[in-house]
């Protein structure tokens, strides 16, 4: 998500270290210290303005959540949205999804979420897609054996590409939905900002769940 840079973004994030960190590598191996108590850990890569990760933290107090966003202004907007909620099981990160192995210990994450990622439609940009094989290898390193990944998008091309990429990587599919909002899987679904927008226009939302095999 790209928005115009706001001068207040970095100062706001610096003013709330209890909720936001811009130095995620310093917490490698000790993320649970940022929460009220140790619990299973789930991470959203590319949280945007935070609607999904905040909603998940509210709906699942038994799980600790981390929202990761590379764009400083967008991350700061997510912080503004999260602060009034005062959720003890949520922390936010200004960081790059390509650096998960520098932020998290091997096998420390229970589940990853990729929601409405940039499709990077040009072939020469394939390596930037969050479901490209090098990203999947990075995810496999930090996710627990047998741990899962959930992916939602409105982009049919990216979804089809991701199905192929995950399959070629050897991931095991737990579910594939070509119209999430018209399926039973939509019960309890926490929507993102983009998801609400595209669904209101009648655009089908695609979703997959998959996990890494246990060697």
Swiss-Prot record:
What positions does the entry give for S-adenosyl-L-methionine binding? 44, 69, 96, 118
Q: Which reaction does it catalyse?
A: guanosine(46) in tRNA + S-adenosyl-L-methionine = N(7)-methylguanosine(46) in tRNA + S-adenosyl-L-homocysteine
Q: Which SUPFAM superfamilies match?
A: S-adenosyl-L-methionine-dependent methyltransferases
In this protein, the active site sits at 118
> What does the record give under GO molecular function?
tRNA (guanine(46)-N7)-methyltransferase activity
Protein family membership: Belongs to the class I-like SAM-binding methyltransferase superfamily. TrmB family.
This chain's protein is named tRNA (guanine-N(7)-)-methyltransferase
Encoding gene, per UniProt annotation: trmB
């Amino acid at each position: 998500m790209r928005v115009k840079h706001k001068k207040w973004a970095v100062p706001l994030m610096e003013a709330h270290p209890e909720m936001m960190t811009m130095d995620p590598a310093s917490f490698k191996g000790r993320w649970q210290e940022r929460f009220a108590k140790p619990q299973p850990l789930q991470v959203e890569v590319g949280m945007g303005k935070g609607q999904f990760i905040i909603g998940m933290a509210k709906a699942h107090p038994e799980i600790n959540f981390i929202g990761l966003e590379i764009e400083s202004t967008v991350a700061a907007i997510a912080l503004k949205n999260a602060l009034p909620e005062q959720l003890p099981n949520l922390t936010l990160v200004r960081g790059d999804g390509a650096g998960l192995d520098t932020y998290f210990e091997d096998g420390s994450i229970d589940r990853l979420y990729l929601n409405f990622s940039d499709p990077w439609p040009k072939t020469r940009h394939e390596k930037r897609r969050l479901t490209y094989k090098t990203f999947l290898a990075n995810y496999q390193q930090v996710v627990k054996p047998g741990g899962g990944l959930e992916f939602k998008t409105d982009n049919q091309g990216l979804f089809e590409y991701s199905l192929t990429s995950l399959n070629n990587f050897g991931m095991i599919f737990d579910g594939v939905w070509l119209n999430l909002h018209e399926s039973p899987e939509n019960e309890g679904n926490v929507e993102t900002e983009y998801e609400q927008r595209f669904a209101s226009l009648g655009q089908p939302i695609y979703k997959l769940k998959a996990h890494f095999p246990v060697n």
